[in-house]
Amino acid sequence: MNRIDYKSRPFLIIKEADDRFPKDYNALPVSKITDRSRRHVKYDVAINKNDYPNLNLTQPISFIRIHKMQTVNEKDLYAAIVSDIDAEYPDLVVNIKLLIEEYYTNF
């Protein structure tokens, strides 16, 4: 019997795309990107597990993929909020916001 497996992937939710139920969110994927050739020098933001312990990352180094924004429906989300990144790491948030603005206004 064939089975479809699903892989859990972390996202950084940026904002609500709309306020109707079910809600859509604009989100940035968080990935380990093991193949260095697949990393974008500027728009894959490295986050070290030791520097950001409250994000509960599973990998020593993960990347917030600024240039890979996706729309995620709340029905596809199954985990609770891991961390309030705005409150925990405001400097990281400022950097992410600047890169988002730069990338999406210059395409």
Can you say where each PLM-predicted feature lies in the sequence?
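C-terminal terminal-subdomain/extension
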Residues: 46-107
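Glycine-centered flexibility motif
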Residues: 1-3, 62
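Compact nucleic-acid interaction/catalytic patches
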Residues: 3-8, 13-51
